[in-house]
């Protein structure tokens, strides 16, 4: 049996109360999470963003990781300022905690650690002047929660691009090992005024 969203459901044995369980879940279980929350972005997700949004020539990628976003940006003619709090071997990475950066004058495209996504988005918007675009690749569940309600009231998104086919985020950038796309992601785009 399937629910309205196409998820398989299980019905409890006859003679008892019916309980339905959706078998869709996040592909990141608590004990299996990467310690620094490093899940690389499928390059196709960046190509899809660039097909619908234009960005300045120079882009800041504050969570560059292995360069999966940065490489697509470079292939499309952008100069990328690559930084991360950890050196994951991507050439030219500036080792810096983005949350301590005081100012930014470049468009930002990134997939921040989900456990700190609100902090990254808020900081990006706080340090970026009018005219700078901020695009963050986030789980659609980022739209939920009381804590983020105040955030969205203060920083309303301009566009939310939701994929018709789910994108993959690979733990430690190992796409050949991790093929799950159990989580729905989207590009959250702000145009600070």
Where do the model's predicted regions map?
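Class I S-adenosyl-L-methionine-dependent methyltransferase catalytic core
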Residues: 1-193
